[in-house]
Regions:
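Secreted/periplasmic carbohydrate-active enzymes, especially glycoside hydrolases
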Residues: 1-308
């Protein structure tokens, strides 16, 4: 899998599969419309959407563009909570556990450019001591500790055990489904798989590039905010030097960004980055040596419109 975030550029293409998909609770015969990406839990007044504990199914048609002939094609999910099973024309092609990390499925051996297929995604929101987040299906209280005799805890256990509804032993609502974007992606067959940048305040930028394919020249360039080159190196790993670097800071008007441009054969990838130092001294959090105060922390990334 490529760990790089998808992008459209001169060598890469992507198609967003977001929109209205078919949806049903596993075991039902009828399909109904659902928005993707989004948690399904709040998309209907039907209590089953909020209370579901178990598997649901999504379905839609996908087509590989004919113009992608000769390119590597893959299907990328940015997140499906909490475990996923992916099927193409009814055949399992991938599984994944964990609802907060992306995963990809190579399509070259499964579909030809110009071909259409039926994509099905099974999502399961049940969590236990082997999943992230860790939880239990109503057997114990928050964080796995058992607190007998507390009425609310005992009622929650009974509700989960008797009705199988979505009340796992965690301290947040268990939003689930295809929660982040789904895309079809095309890259050259020899492509940039990953890149790492470690900038320092003195202008040094340590870099490493991981590629898929035969060895070939790799060009790494750094462009300033105006798009002008300020450093370059032909190597798979090394150190770039930026003279008189501009620092990234979170204050208005100061978040200066450079762009690292990597070229490998026919592939190209650009990654914005900033030069800054983060340090903790006693009770002070420092960015580039200046104190920074945090305001309004949020424990969970819940949205009243989209869920998680």
């Amino acid at each position: 899998m490529s760990t790089l975030y998808p992008q459209n550029n001169a060598s890469r293409m992507m198609l967003d599969l977001g929109g209205i998909w078919d949806f049903r609770f596993q075991g039902d015969s009828a399909w109904q419309p659902i928005a993707v990406p989004a948690s399904y839990n709040d998309q209907s007044p039907d209590p089953r959407f909020r209370n579901q504990a178990g598997k649901v199914e999504y379905r839609r048609k996908i087509t590989l563009p004919a113009s992608w002939k000769g390119m590597r094609a893959c299907l990328r999910f940015d997140a499906v909570a909490h475990s996923a099973r992916i099927l193409l024309n009814g055949r399992e092609i991938a599984t994944h556990r964990g609802g907060f990390l992306p995963f990809e499925v190579e399509l070259d051996a499964l579909m030809a450019p110009g071909e259409t297929a039926e994509l099905t995604v099974e999502a399961d929101n049940r969590i236990n001591h082997d999943t992230l987040p860790i939880g239990t299906e109503g057997d114990t209280a928050f964080f796995g500790s058992d607190n007998p005799g507390i009425p609310a805890v005992e009622a929650g256990k009974r509700m989960q055990q008797e009705r199988g509804i979505n009340r796992p032993a965690v301290d947040f609502f268990n939003y689930t489904g295809i929660q982040r974007p789904v895309r079809l992606i095309a890259t050259p067959r020899q492509f940039i798989r990953d890149m790492t940048l470690i900038p320092s305040m003195n202008g040094e930028v340590r870099f490493s590039v991981e590629t898929e394919g035969t060895d070939g020249p790799i060009l790494v360039e750094v462009l300033d905010a105006e798009g002008l080159p300020v450093a370059r190196c032909e190597a798979r790993e090394g150190i770039l030097h930026i003279a008189e670097p501009h620092l990234w800071e979170p204050w208005p008007g100061t978040p200066y960004l450079y762009t690292a441009r990597v070229t490998y054969g026919e592939d190209l990838y650009e990654q914005p980055f900033g030069i800054r130092e983060v340090r903790v001294e006693g009770t002070r959090f420092l960015i580039n040596g200046k104190p920074f105060r945090f305001h309004g922390p949020c424990k969970h990334e819940d949205s009243p419109v989209h869920g998680r």
